[in-house]
């Protein structure tokens, strides 16, 4: 879901059952926005609730992991969608590097744009492989850079 009031944008898991969340605008939770999805995925991997193959463990496999019990569940299908997004981002980056004839090591800075980039916990994105680990320390959120760049050219 988009980053609207009530979207879970932050999540931290304590133990195996206590997911503490923050929503946009501190409103009642209505779903997960992109940054919330990354946080939940990271926490489930960190606590070995999702294994290295991306399989949600028992007893959560059938119904999903309760992010907000009785209301919002993170399912096996959600995990597959994250895996597909990771694959697309990594493939895109690899093609860009190959076409530019440069390596990860030669990258000095990566600007992560948009509202998603501003709210993204870079360490969690690195931790789940959404972004290559070689970019640690090189990631800079820049917000709505398209709008800013267009204003510069007016």
Model-inferred region functions:
Residues 8, 16, 100, 104-105, ...:
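Non-transmembrane, aqueous-exposed alpha-helical and coiled segments at domain scale
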Residues 83-105:
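Phosphate/ATP-binding catalytic cores across multiple sugar-kinase/actin-like superfamilies
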Residues 1-35, 121-143:
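Glycine-rich phosphate-binding loop of actin/hexokinase-like ATP-binding domains
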Residues 152-154:
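Conserved small/polar residues in nucleotide/adenosyl-binding loops
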Residues 76-85, 129-150:
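Glycine-rich and small/hydrophobic secondary-structure elements
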Residues 38-85:
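Gly/charged contiguous loops adjacent to phosphate- or pyrophosphate-bearing nucleotide/cofactor binding elements
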Residues 104-124:
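Glycine-rich phosphate-binding loops at beta-strand->alpha-helix junctions
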Residues 51-60, 98-108:
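Flexible, glycine/charged-enriched surface loops at secondary-structure junctions
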């Amino acid at each position: 879901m988009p980053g609207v009031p009530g979207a879970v944008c932050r999540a931290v898991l304590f133990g195996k059952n206590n997911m503490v969340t923050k929503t946009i605008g501190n409103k009642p939770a209505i779903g997960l926005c992109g940054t919330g999805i990354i946080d939940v995925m990271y926490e489930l991997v960190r606590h070995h609730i999702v294994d290295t193959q991306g399989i949600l463990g028992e007893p959560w496999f059938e119904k999903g992991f309760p992010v907000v019990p009785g209301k919002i569940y993170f399912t096996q299908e959600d995990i597959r969608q994250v895996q597909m997004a990771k694959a697309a981002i990594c493939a895109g980056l690899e093609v860009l590097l190959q076409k530019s004839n440069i390596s990860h090591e030669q990258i000095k800075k990566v600007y992560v744009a948009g509202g998603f980039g501003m709210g993204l916990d870079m360490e969690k994105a690195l931790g789940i492989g959404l972004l290559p680990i070689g970019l640690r320390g090189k990631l800079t959120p820049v917000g709505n850079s398209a709008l800013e760049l267009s204003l510069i050219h007016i």
